[in-house]
């Protein structure tokens, strides 16, 4: 069995702070599509917690709000080509 080259890479940098906790926002509103758009990729996918820097509670609420906004046709399911 051949050995793998390279070791485990470590992530460096500052830990991101949850935007909602920082601004004391308690409710993630599905109608605020400008805010929700910040947490989706250019392809329309929901970004991961390690990318957005949200806490677990607000990541769940944001994902739920994005899904509701998609149902109401405020956000696209996928981005146009």
From Swiss-Prot:
Pfam families reported for this sequence: Ribosomal_S18
Keywords: Ribonucleoprotein, Ribosomal protein, RNA-binding, rRNA-binding
InterPro entries: Ribosomal_bS18, Ribosomal_bS18_sf
Superkingdom assignment: Bacteria
SUPFAM superfamilies assigned to the protein according to its UniProt record, in alphabetical order: Ribosomal protein S18 (SSF46911)
GO biological-process terms attached to the record: translation
Any coiled-coil regions, as ranges: none
GO molecular function ontology, one term from the record: small ribosomal subunit rRNA binding
SUBUNIT field: Part of the 30S ribosomal subunit. Forms a tight heterodimer with protein bS6.
Purpose of the protein: Binds as a heterodimer with protein bS6 to the central domain of the 16S rRNA, where it helps stabilize the platform of the 30S subunit.
Family as reported in the entry's similarity comment: Belongs to the bacterial ribosomal protein bS18 family.
Protein name (record): Small ribosomal subunit protein bS18
Gene name of this polypeptide: rpsR
């Amino acid at each position: 069995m051949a050995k793998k080259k390279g070791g485990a890479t470590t992530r460096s940098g500052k830990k991101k702070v949850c935007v909602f906790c920082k601004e004391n926002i308690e409710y993630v509103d599905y109608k605020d599509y400008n805010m929700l758009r910040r947490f989706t990729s250019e392809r329309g996918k929901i970004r991961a917690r390690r990318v957005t820097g949200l806490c677990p509670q607000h990541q769940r609420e944001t994902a739920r709000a994005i899904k509701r906004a998609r149902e109401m046709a405020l956000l696209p399911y996928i981005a146009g080509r």
